């Protein structure tokens, strides 16, 4: 019903689709008298109106219908879910395309592939068209990954929808001591609706992961940094210890009086009850 909802809402007359899968959107478009153009990695698509194409292969052009479409719909595979397989299971890889099966990729590689597909589909659309992408949340081996938070957003974000999902793997499992677990069962998917405002501009937002030492962060305060050092160390800590931990770090380079700033911050933390002043120039982290 998701494709039908958006066809009605945006008065779609020509729907394009990446990751056409079992042909549900094709069937909906046929029933609603909407022109359909779809592609899928499957060498033997289940519907005659779905073309075989590897969206990750930039030597292959998208079908002409993408350039006329009012909307493109994407419901990509969910990378790194071990219990679901497409190539070699739901369909046979007769042309050596399994390497592009996003389902078999790790999360980071899979999301890069999905974002590449998103940009390719967006680039083909005429101005004023919409790109709709349905993605999920993944919990695997104790890690929670949000596809939505890692999704590229080209053009203008029109709206976000939250869709109830009634057959998630998370919802079918019984977890030991579920009531005391910090996790809730995953029973939803996310839908991004994106509008292409112009024909020439490619404007997009893509999440980027940063990793750095807090001592080199320009956004961390002296209090943040001193507390991080204290929490990461054991026993009684001297002022000289904090000097050594911070000497040469970016936080100290912009302050010629950084040692005095460290002493001031240590005193403030002791007054706040976060550190204990145990002697002259000696400090200890107070565990809770």
Segments and roles (model prediction):
Residues 1-288:
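Class I S-adenosyl-L-methionine-dependent methyltransferase catalytic core
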């Amino acid at each position: 019903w998701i494709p039908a909802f958006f066809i009605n809402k945006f008065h779609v007359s020509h729907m394009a689709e990446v990751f056409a899968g079992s042909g549900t959107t094709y069937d909906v478009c046929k029933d609603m008298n909407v022109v359909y153009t779809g592609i899928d990695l499957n060498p033997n698509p289940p519907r005659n109106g779905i073309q075989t194409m590897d969206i990750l292969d930039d030597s292959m052009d998208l079908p002409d219908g993408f350039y006329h479409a009012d909307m493109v719909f994407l419901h990509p595979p969910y990378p790194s879910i071990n219990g679901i397989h497409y190539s070699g299971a739901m369909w046979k890889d007769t042309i050596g395309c399994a390497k592009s099966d996003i389902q078999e990729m790790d999360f980071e590689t899979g999301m890069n592939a999905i974002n590449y597909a998103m940009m390719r589909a967006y680039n083909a659309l005429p101005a004023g068209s919409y790109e709709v992408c349905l993605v999920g949340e993944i919990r695997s081996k104790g890690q929670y990954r949000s596809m939505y938070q890692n999704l590229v957003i080209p053009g203008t974000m029109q709206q976000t929808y939250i869709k109830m999902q009634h057959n998630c793997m998370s919802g079918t499992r019984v977890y030991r001591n579920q009531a005391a677990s910090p996790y809730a069962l995953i029973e939803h998917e996310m839908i991004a609706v994106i509008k292409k405002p112009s024909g020439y501009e490619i404007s997009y937002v893509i999440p980027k992961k940063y990793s750095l030492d807090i001592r080199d962060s320009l956004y961390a305060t002296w209090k943040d940094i001193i507390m991080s050092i204290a929490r990461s160390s054991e026993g009684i800590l001297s002022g000289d210890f904090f000097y050594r931990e911070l000497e040469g770090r970016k936080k100290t380079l912009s302050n010629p009086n950084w040692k005095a700033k460290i002493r001031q911050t240590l005193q403030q933390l002791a007054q706040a009850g976060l550190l204990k002043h145990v002697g002259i120039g000696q400090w200890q982290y107070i565990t809770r």
